[in-house]
Amino acid sequence: MALQDKLKQIGQAFAGITNNCYHYWRAKKDLPCIVWAESAEDTSFNSDNKKSEQRIVGTVDLFTRTEFDPLADQVQGVLNTLGVTWVLNSVQFEEDTNLIHYEWEWGVTFDGEVEEQP
C-alpha cells in the first residue's frame, strides 16, 4: 500500500467518530476535536537497494472540555481497528485553554515499495 493511501485511511477512520477531525491543526472553536498527524519514519528496512518495509509514526490528540469524555475510548477503538501500534502518551489539563488534552503516539508498518512513476 502506498504511503498516502495508508495515511488517508487513518484520517478517514478518525473522521468517522467526529466531524471535528483535523490533519495537523485544529479549529479553535470546534470542541471536542481530534487532530492527527504523521511525524516521521521510524525503523524501516531496505533490500536490493530500495525500501522494502516502511514504518511511519505519528500522534493523535483529543482536545475536550468534558471530563471522562467517551471520545477518548473511541479514539483507542479506532487505533485498535486500524491495526497500528499505539500508546497513550499523556493526558493533561491545559490551564491556558481550559482543555483536557489526550495524546496518543501511533506507528504503522507497511510494504514500503513505491510504484515507479512514468
State each model region's role.
Residues 1-57, 63-118:
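Long, contiguous binding/interaction regions
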